[in-house]
A protein has these predicted regions:
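Non-catalytic C-terminal accessory/binding modules of secreted extracellular proteins
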Residues: 16-72, 137-176, 246-391
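Secretory-pathway/luminal and periplasmic proteins that interact with or process carbohydrate-rich
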Residues: 132-146, 202, 225-226
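Fold-level signature of zinc-dependent metallopeptidase catalytic domains
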Residues: 1-28, 85-90, 131
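Acidic, glycine-anchored loop motifs typical of Ca2+
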Residues: 111-124, 278-282
Length: 440
């Protein structure tokens, strides 16, 4: 898949970042970045690793290998305020900026090569405009990063026989640091191009907590100063078809490895049935369980552990980008382990360690007849009992039996004869009554 990225100057604001740097940040195979600045009297030192290309390649576990062609900068015909000033709480004409940018690069770009499915429409165009953006501190005349459709705005743009319709855009500079922005906003907006909706409350008037820093579709693009967005969650990968969660039904002692490394997650359905189709789920209500650790793209998450998400899919909400606009029925809802749902950004909107298990709690009994108990974490692996689990360790050894020796699955004799003192795993226990396999 191939996409076009256009760098845009205004008549009064021009790019200060080299095109080569923007190209490396979006497409580089070994991109790194280090910088520091003072904020509220304190020095902030930022280190980041990974380009936008690397982010999508990693988040898709190699299923998605995008090619971003970076063109420009080109200069549109008006100043920034012409396109970005607020009119009835909306930017005046960002779509005009996008159309002009496409027309300006038409002589050097063959738009046909960006219609990957040959449906007559360019699959996506992304514009990075010079200067600041309104979402991260720019004034009211700057443009708010967003994705939209030219045709929806009444704009027709046909180049090389292809319509340019779906687009996204974001700003060059971060007003807080006076350095160029990281990949966070680009990855967020480009995720819309891929079909994913926002998971924050999109009216701008909500005061309740959504999924926050745990997701690229909410506050996550700002993790590590916008340089290290969180990896796609289990739900986001499931929606894209990049992950197939395992439906768990029977009582089980669950061992769940870290999401990025294992590409594995679990799904609970109240009916114990599910079609396992992420973008057309049936039943529409289900739960996803994933192991999030502060490694790789998740290094700057608020915590680590078992993440439990309740999904209540509604086609209209997904299509209208209003997934979490109802606090009473959010479409993708983080189940906070500690039961604390902050009411505003001032007390934990972005997320906290207690959102996940076992930091916030060691059990969740909120799904009728589908208990999650004895949640623990060891060496980055999550363990818990589902629906009561199955008898393990000393529960499987009768009290009248005496343990003679314990071997691991490789046949290596263990020094201990106390099962509970051993790490989680599978063992063969030799007792005075015989031998048996034990799951610890």
């Amino acid at each position: 898949p191939r996409g076009l990225v256009i760098l845009v100057n205004f008549t009064d604001v021009a790019f200060t970042t080299d095109k080569a740097e923007m190209d490396s940040m979006l497409t580089g195979k070994n991109y790194t970045r280090d910088y520091s600045y003072f904020y509220r009297g304190k020095k902030q030192s930022i280190t980041s690793k990974g380009s936008a290309w690397q982010y999508f390649y990693d988040s898709s576990n190699g299923h998605y290998d995008p090619q971003f062609d970076v063109i420009g900068p080109v200069t549109v015909s008006k100043n920034m305020a012409y396109y970005g000033k607020n009119v009835n709480d909306f930017d005046a004409a960002p779509w005009t900026m996008v159309k002009e940018a496409c027309q300006l690069v038409d002589d050097s770009v063959d738009f046909k090569q960006y219609d990957n499915n040959n449906d007559g429409y360019v699959d996506f165009v992304y514009v990075i405009y010079a200067g600041y953006g309104e979402a991260d501190g720019g004034d009211k005349n700057t443009i708010w990063p967003h994705s939209y459709w030219l045709l929806e705005a009444g704009i027709t743009c046909k180049l090389d026989g292809k319509y340019v319709d779906l687009y996204a855009c974001g700003n060059e500079m971060d007003s807080r640091t006076n350095y160029h922005t990281g990949i966070g906003t680009f990855c967020h907006e480009f995720s819309h191009v891929l079909g994913l909706p926002d998971l924050y409350e999109t009216t701008g008037y909500g005061t309740y907590k959504t999924i926050g820093a745990w997701s690229i579709l909410d506050y996550g693009p700002y993790n590590n100063d916008g340089n290290t967005p969180p990896a796609y969650s289990a739900y986001e990968q499931f929606f894209m078809g990049w992950l197939m969660p395992r439906l768990i039904v029977d009582a089980e002692n669950v061992e769940l490895e870290e999401l990025q490394a294992s590409n594995s997650a679990l799904l609970i359905s109240s009916s114990d049935q599910h079609n396992l189709i992420g973008n057309d789920p049936k039943p529409t209500t289900f739960y996803l369980l994933e192991n999030r650790q502060q490694v790789g793209w998740d290094e700057y998450l608020p915590g680590h552990g078992l993440m439990l998400t309740k999904v209540q899919y509604d086609y209209n909400k997904w299509t209208n980008n209003t997934v979490n606009n109802s606090s009473n029925r959010m479409g993708v809802d983080l189940i906070e382990a500690d039961g604390k749902k902050p009411s505003s950004s001032s007390n934990g909107y972005t997320g906290k360690a207690g959102d996940l298990f076992p930091a916030g709690a060691t059990e969740y009994l909120g799904i009728t007849n589908h208990s999650i108990e004895d949640v623990s974490e060891q060496d980055g692996i999550i363990y818990f009992k589902y629906r009561g689990g199955i008898a393990t360790s000393t529960e499987q050894v009768q009290t009248e039996e005496t343990i003679v020796a314990i071997y691991n699955i490789l046949g290596q004799k263990q020094a201990a004869v106390d099962i509970e003192s051993l790490p989680h795993g599978t063992y063969v226990v030799v007792t005075t009554a015989g031998s048996k396999k034990i799951v610890r």
